[in-house]
Amino acid sequence: MPSFHDFRFLSTDGKHKVFARECTPDGEVRAVLQIAHGVAEHIYRYAPFMEFLANHGFVVVANDHLGHGKTAENEQELCFFAEKDGWNDVVSDMDQLHKLTAAKYPDVPYFLFGHSMGSFLTRTYIIDHPEGLKGGIISGTGQNPAAVVAAGKLMAKLEMIDNGPMYHSPTLDKLAFGSYNKKYDHVRTKLDWRTRDEAIVDQYIADPLCGAMATAGIFHDMMGGLQYIW
């Protein structure tokens, strides 16, 4: 059966120890898949998916981004990348994991999978580091009009000026996610939009490393990332 191995490496920011996982198959390796997770979650949520792929011959690796999961050093850091240039730090950490893993499995195809915010990071990565990738898989992505993104970035900047980049902003969080449940007639929780599987919704809500309110800093970073991949 597949086996998991947890490890850490030094982030590009020079301060944090990035938490990462590798799931390896019990048998021949067909390919490698690297996962970039979404905002306000962490890689342990992907364990069943990683194990499923490993059962089909994939080595699967993933890391908790800065400000997420076990890479975050405290609750205040959740949903916060960095004081400056956080988006590029996170992409560079993904590149570090790619290089570490590709060196171990140099003779098989290497794929990058990104979900939600991870899809934006993956699109950035493909622009900046296309070498060594066989392909990219984009899940739960999107692209708002340029004017909307610019306005969101400005609002985040103003929030940073008023309250600091680590401020967990109810205003920005509502703007980003507040309308998602409106698409459904009957909702049980404010996070029903995440999945139709009620058990998974409940697990997410109960997880202290999931669902942190977006900080002004990460919102500003994401808007900058969206402008870059436009």
What are the language-model segments listed below?
Residues 45-77:
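Conserved alpha/beta-hydrolase
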Residues 1-27:
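N-terminal cap/lid segment of alpha/beta-hydrolase-fold proteins
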Residues 124-209:
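Alpha/beta-hydrolase-fold enzymes
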Residues 114-124:
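Glycine-rich nucleophile elbow surrounding the catalytic serine of serine-hydrolase chemistry
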Residues 215-230:
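Active-site nucleophile elbow and catalytic-triad environment of alpha/beta-hydrolase enzymes
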Residues 33, 37-41, 116-117:
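Active-site glycine-rich loops that stabilize anionic/oxyanionic intermediates
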Residues 82-103:
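Alpha/beta-hydrolase active-site loop
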Residues 105-116:
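Alpha/beta-hydrolase fold nucleophile elbow
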